[in-house]
């Protein structure tokens, strides 16, 4: 739960000249006493193709903040034309109003801004070099894009550090040098065990040749009951196996996936 909630933002001077400062009336609610100030920023997106043209127009520290509903006026300078490509001055762009606590952004409000001339003639046939004195901006204040982020506040416990600290990672042996060594050792051990089992089976066959007739009679005597029991148990195991598979699929248990299962990590969604 967020300690600070943004209740509303009003764009006071809108529409306005391109060179006029931005003015916002911001209303927010604070649920508990904060140890530090809130930092508000206004960023102008100078180009849709590259973030290098983004400009931080102004920032403001607000505090100490009393518990309850608070309201203040945030005024920011217009963008620096020297940092905007000439082809990007006119048209639609974006401004971002953000608020952070202790360096952690928890709310972002995006507005579309339309920059155009104040006459139809100039808009139909714009001059090669923009006439800034005739350019007006119109912030689409009725359609803001609000994004909220979960952050750590004063009373929250520290989040689990990810990835975990691994102080011995640099002194460990390079995986590239030992890649596949363990598999080769297991394969060699398995071959040795199979060879030993083959030699033991050969010895047993030599000793047990004299008991073939007796073993055949004994096996024939109990074969009927054993087959019946075996077939019944096989059916039960088969039914149980299908029930288990249905349960795994239905419950979504991926702890023991079958070889033909393909696991697709959910993309992680990202809103801008």
Swiss-Prot record:
The organism of origin for this protein: Coccidioides immitis (strain RS) (Valley fever fungus)
Database matches in InterPro entries: ASF1-like, ASF1-like_sf, Hist_deposition_Asf1
Top-level taxonomy: Eukaryota, Fungi, Dikarya, Ascomycota, Pezizomycotina
PANTHER family: ANTI-SILENCING PROTEIN 1, HISTONE CHAPERONE ASF1
Pfam families: ASF1_hist_chap
Coiled coil ranges: 181-206
Identification of the protein by name: Histone chaperone ASF1
Basic and acidic residues bias locations: 201-211, 261-272
Family: Belongs to the ASF1 family.
Keywords noted in UniProt: Chaperone, Chromatin regulator, Coiled coil, Nucleus, Transcription, Transcription regulation
Compositionally biased region (Acidic residues): 212-253
The protein's role, per its UniProt record: Histone chaperone that facilitates histone deposition and histone exchange and removal during nucleosome assembly and disassembly.
Subcellular location: Nucleus
Region Disordered, annotated ranges: 152-173, 195-272
Entries under Gene3D superfamilies matching the protein: Histone chaperone ASF1-like
């Amino acid at each position: 739960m967020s300690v600070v909630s943004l209740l509303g933002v009003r764009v006071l001077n809108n529409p306005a000249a391109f060179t006029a400062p931005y003015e916002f009336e911001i209303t927010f609610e604070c649920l508990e006493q904060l140890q530090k100030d809130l930092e508000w920023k206004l960023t102008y997106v100078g180009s849709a193709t590259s973030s290098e043209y983004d400009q931080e127009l102004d920032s403001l520290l607000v505090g100490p903040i009393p518990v309850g509903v608070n309201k203040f006026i945030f005024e920011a300078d217009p963008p620096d034309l020297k940092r905007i490509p000439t082809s990007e001055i006119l048209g639609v762009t974006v401004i971002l109003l953000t608020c952070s606590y202790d360096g952690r952004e928890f709310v972002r409000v995006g507005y579309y801004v339309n920059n155009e001339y104040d006459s139809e003639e100039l808009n139909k046939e714009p001059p090669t070099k923009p006439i800034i004195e005739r350019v007006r901006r119109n912030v689409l204040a009725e359609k803001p894009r609000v994004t909220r982020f979960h952050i750590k506040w004063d009373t929250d416990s520290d989040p689990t550090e990810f990835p975990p600290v691994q102080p011995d990672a640099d002194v460990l042996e390079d995986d590239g040098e030992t890649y596949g060594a363990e598999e080769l050792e297991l394969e060699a051990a398995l071959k040795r065990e199979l060879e030993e089992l083959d030699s033991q089976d050969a010895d047993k066959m030599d000793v047990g040749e004299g008991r073939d007739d007796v073993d055949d009679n004994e096996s024939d005597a109990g074969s009927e009951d054993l087959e019946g029991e075996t077939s019944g148990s096989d059916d039960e195991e088969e039914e149980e196996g299908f029930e288990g598979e249905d349960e795994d699929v239905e419950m979504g248990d991926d702890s023991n996936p079958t070889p033909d299962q393909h696991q697709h990590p959910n993309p992680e969604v990202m809103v801008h």
